[in-house]
Amino acid sequence: MSYIIKEIEEAWQIKENILHDSSKLIKLKKILNESIASLNQGIIRVCEKQGNQWKVNEWVKKAILLYFITTESQLYNNNYNSWYDKVAPKFPADTDKNIFKEAAIRKVPGAIVRTGTYIAKNVVIMPSFINIGAYIDEGTMIDTWATIGSCAQIGKNCHISGGAGIGGVLEPLQAKPVIIEDNCFVGARSEIAEGVIVEEGSVISMGVFIGSSTKIVYRDTGEIIYGRIPAYSVVVPGILPPPEVGKPGLYCVVIVKQVDKTTRGKVSINDLLR
């Protein structure tokens, strides 16, 4: 892997001219195809947890961006649609059923998954869109019309509900993607973007919008934080009162409670929201 990283870093330095050097281009394409295949298999990933911190592997982002630069668009078809793109589908129309059986995943009509995406065992993909570089861990459901952006990281046993959006990021290189840790629920039509981290066991109610500048308010203390939903939080949309009467209030999200693993195991997600 160190050889691949070295080659990608060197190619990145000359990316503006790489298309004009045919010998380097042929060599680079082979390396990039290996990198995309490794993303597909979960061997490498854009972001990974080391201890309690998430670390961005910038070279993987560079590999994806170089793949876009060096790949020409082509026509793709399945039984009911055609499209013209630089990125092939992860599951083309002629995918053998044994591939799905061995992977232990379920994918229904209308689900679009680009290559360079890792889909772990027992994942269910309803009609939705999952972009290149995304990582979907075991037992997660991507529900109808949800979108998973490029490089987004979704943990084990999560439920990304209907119409929810999980933002993606390829640039800037050092920026973290949106990260949804294990055992999280993201409610319908919610949007999590701009590198926000939703920590393990959290429940995001329907219609919650969280970006890097969104105020996240603890209801019991009034403390305000940004960019991170603490583990085992239950979050609903809210509004902060204006400083002066007659002025508009501002949108925020509210941590209404935090529960431990024991409590969460005894109640359903709907009970927690209520």
From Swiss-Prot:
InterPro entries linked to this entry: DapD_Trfase_Hexpep_rpt_fam, Hexapep, THP_succinylTrfase_dom1, THP_succinylTrfase_N_sf, Trans_hexapeptide_repeat, Trimer_LpxA-like_sf
GO CC annotations on file: cytoplasm
Subcellular location: Cytoplasm
Keywords in alphabetical order: Acyltransferase, Amino-acid biosynthesis, Cytoplasm, Diaminopimelate biosynthesis, Lysine biosynthesis, Repeat, Transferase
EC number: 2.3.1.117
Pfam families per record: Hexapep, Hexapep_2, THDPS_N_2
Protein's pathway: Amino-acid biosynthesis; L-lysine biosynthesis via DAP pathway; LL-2,6-diaminopimelate from (S)-tetrahydrodipicolinate (succinylase route): step 1/3
Family under the similarity heading: Belongs to the transferase hexapeptide repeat family.
Protein name from the UniProt record: 2,3,4,5-tetrahydropyridine-2,6-dicarboxylate N-succinyltransferase
Source organism: Rickettsia prowazekii (strain Madrid E)
